[in-house]
């Protein structure tokens, strides 16, 4: 199962999965990707849980 959490450190709309993943690693998540959230793309961090 994968648990997802919106990044707390990522600023602004998310257009780059690699940037998102880099920020997520600083938040102790192994990976992250951009996902649509209403009208804005946000960075979501993922880990196995």
Curated annotation (Swiss-Prot):
Domain of life: Eukaryota
Cystine residue pairs: 3-49, 14-34, 20-43, 24-45
Membership in a protein family: Belongs to the DEFL family.
Record bears the keyword Disulfide bond: yes
PROSITE patterns: GAMMA_THIONIN
The protein's name in its UniProt record: Defensin Tk-AMP-D2
Taxonomic lineage of the native organism: Eukaryota, Viridiplantae, Streptophyta, Embryophyta, Tracheophyta
Organism: Triticum kiharae
CDD domains in the cross-refs: Knot1
Gene3D superfamilies from the UniProt entry: Knottin, scorpion toxin-like (3.30.30.10)
Keywords in alphabetical order: Antimicrobial, Disulfide bond, Fungicide, Plant defense
